[in-house]
């Protein structure tokens, strides 16, 4: 009795609620004290009592018990307010898209967590006996997070890929979800039908493969006699918490005696219990060697001591226990359970979210300022960081409240600041969990409006895309999308150009994505398709002329050039020295009478350079146009080609010639015929040499258009069918016509001896046709005669004073026939063929030094009042200049910068060097125009790409810019690039004292403030040249015309006293962000963000633009100045995020590790290290030892890291799996080695797979070195490479496995469980056969082993300590391995 009393006195008296963890502790202590049987009896009583009480209490759960937390309303409102501010910052361009996503997720996550914490006190205060409250905090299945969804808010969900959906579900399940919320919640729910089915099957399959690998592992012996061990260090080393250490050690068996000084505190082969672990921790033992399944010396089973305690009853595992199957199931089973958990309903960024501390009431904050340091939060907001515990006092009128803020937290308020109730005063940083998987994610940002791209910093070409349009940002900057769509119609829009204003040639062309309305008439396209070259071959390359813009892509830009400008117009000429201008004058009435469809076409080659004898313009006379096929004949007329070979027009690389034949005669003939080209397989309904009428069916779906003689010629793959109209003459003696063949007969020759001797009215063409050898007849075909008029009609086309040019530029008008004599011309149906073309040929006198080889043509538009005129301007280019231009042109496009010849004429003493210098400074033509009433106030518009540079004057004295304007007297080419950095960087609004100037063409200084008239029309802004990083000049997108609609422009009125008040100067072309406090508007400080387009005395016009912030390393897509459409990719961010620790992502991770196929898998890193080790160790220890220890080390390392990886996933889920289960599996997938080719052995052939232990033993017994290297199997491959073919066949690929086994004559010894189950035998496991093992044999072995051990241990440990440094990087430092001798 006394003993009992004494025992009772030792026991602890519990008087509190026992939850799950307390229950676990109680049971384990009961087992320690009383053993299994007694404990189960006690627990039975507890269970019975529990059920009785529950029945008596009769807890029921109704929907009314779900009480929504009252603080939810304002919490959600608060979060919405924060999201709104965030959205605004994103709109201003202060926060980029990824930051916005992160912050919004954090805002909602923090809100949801705070609600969850509020839930418990709320229930405790309002309704402590509420059944929901009792159940949720009972510690039974079900936890706060589910209740939180019922009464708090459902929160953030992740989609099936584990990405966050940044739209939170604000309702809870008690209030009910809206439709959107319901759909989102279906995504994230782990209970979704699809999800559960798919995940469960995955988990099931994982279990099946695991069991397959280890089913044959059974405990067969008590001790295998191994002398190795794995060291675990109880000193709180890296990554080993005390809890993990206890988990690792308890239930294991010691591999070595442990000494504390000279005293042995634990012996070898002793199993470790709680007491022993506590002693180790107290004594801080250096390192503890334990036995694990890894080091067991048996191949296909395991011994009791290496396995350790059985998890079921806490003693050493019994012989005959099927530990393999238990291991497989313990790893696979949690998977199936975890899929069904609504474990973690969102929060990808949980790793870094912070808890908020809120003020309990209104009051003043007090804290010690010496203990905090100013810093910024991770979102860049100012805060205080406290390094140690900080006590914050909040005092209101009658209450004092103390809040303790833990170290490393952020304080978000100032000292002595007044805070309102529930205001966030501090953020407690979450301890970052070490188990989150980081992954790099690319996020594409898409443009949400169409417009023109612009960036405000230099960008680099990504090295792998040197010729593409992928650019890397070197520093944080804004990308701007300037609003304004591309020009969509070819109507001339309201133009901003005034009189004498120069324009670029490319403005007449059309935007790339729209097909052109200026499109070329069909006949023009016809010539291109059928232009023939002198050798008579068909033109190989058919050019596509859907619009006049030809697209040429080269290295850096995609140039689009107008090839032809097709205008119905007259040419009037206006002359200056060395420059020649032809205006096109639109003349509506005359046009209708004279030229219904065709007009003068001007052809300027792509690069704008014309050579000698080039054709500048041509006119297609409608009289020389045919709609049917036929042959042209000149008779015996001599013709010579105008275009000589060396004068070919060069089209970038591809020489393309369409020779024109100049004629010495005034007439030519056209013989019409109808031609059908049919595929070889078609059936023809008419016979060769038969005569048909009009509209006869030739094939199923073609009919003839004329009547006459049919000729059918079969070529290789097609049939050519021609129909000749005209008479047929059979040969008679008296008929002279029939004697001729293939000639033209002029009118006036009569038929003699016929009834009426009739004269021929027209020319005819006689052709002999021979159907058979003896017979022949003659087809007489009508001929159309064309008279070619002399220069009479040419004078009306091209004005006379143009042709009588007194300058050194010469023009002559030439008629040319487009087809050679006798050449058959094919027409495509419903299109016409032009036979003769009138050309304007350009030539010029040689200079004395003969340096002018080519001229540069450009088109100039001048608008006077409401009449717009276009001029062609031809500049004679001196060849050194063009050479410089070419060499400066990086892409080699041959585009010469438009520096015109004006400067050459202004200053005739330019040398070559000077010319190069001016090239780099010249930025192209900038349009300037005087107002009609000739006031001093000029009017100026910025070209859209901000290419005109604005720089301060050199000699300026004035500050009040509005009243003074200075005349420039210096060189107008002031190099401003040096002062302002390369083009494309935008100067910030700064405090410049001097007025600004633009480099203008006519050297009239513009005043800064300009007037915009008639803003309501849509108008067009053109682009000019752009300088790239090397100072070369480009015109990147010559064909783009941007049209603004009125709502793209904002008109800001300035304060009347603006200049005196602020020092800010608004610069033309400057970008303004919406929130930069540019206080200039009358109606308030806000300007919409955009680019300043027009500056006026009292107002500005801003082209609205949307800024996107981009961080360094982001990839920008597209080119500077490119037009982007809605939905185009703008920029790609790369950022790291932590995967949700959700099992949906967890299971694939486990599977990846077990199948050894993860990208960052151990195999990748280890392969390299292993080779290094093998080399070093071989050098130190010689061949046999080297291979042995090299493979040992490899396998030991990879095993440890595999175990750690798998444990990581499960621990992050809160699932406890004992290491030894994982070890058994990992041991199986790392137990094979590959015989390498380094040394030939008599036993194994190279490339053969053998068990590691077998290789070691064979090597020892043969005393010869076997060279092998470690190999990692996945579980599937390991299952298909076991000792038993029956178990392999029952797993996968049955037929293949059985066939191979039969061919090899494999024998199955039926050692495993599965083979016996398949064949219906008894399985070789079960804990009944203790007496079978002879104890004596094992006892004899032990002393011998220990002797051996002492010999080798010292040396080998030294070697391994040396090698620990080698592989220390890939595993935790607390493991190292002692291999066998």
From Swiss-Prot:
Q: Which cofactor does it need?
A: Zn(2+)
UniProt keyword list:
Chloroplast, DNA-directed RNA polymerase, Metal-binding, Nucleotidyltransferase, Plastid, Transcription, Transferase, Zinc
**UniProt GO cellular component terms:** chloroplast; DNA-directed RNA polymerase complex; mitochondrion
Name the Enzyme Commission number(s) assigned to this protein: 2.7.7.6
* CDD domains named in the record: RNAP_beta'_C
Q: How does it assemble?
A: In plastids the minimal PEP RNA polymerase catalytic core is composed of four subunits: alpha, beta, beta', and beta''. When a (nuclear-encoded) sigma factor is associated with the core the holoenzyme is formed, which can initiate transcription.
Could you tell me the Gene Ontology terms of the biological process aspect for this record?
Answer: DNA-templated transcription
The organism encoding this protein is Drimys granadensis
- From the Swiss-Prot or TrEMBL record, state where the protein is found: Plastid, Chloroplast
Q: What is this protein called?
A: DNA-directed RNA polymerase subunit beta''
An example of a GO molecular function for this protein is:
DNA-directed RNA polymerase activity
Per its database record, what is this protein's job? DNA-dependent RNA polymerase catalyzes the transcription of DNA into RNA using the four ribonucleoside triphosphates as substrates.
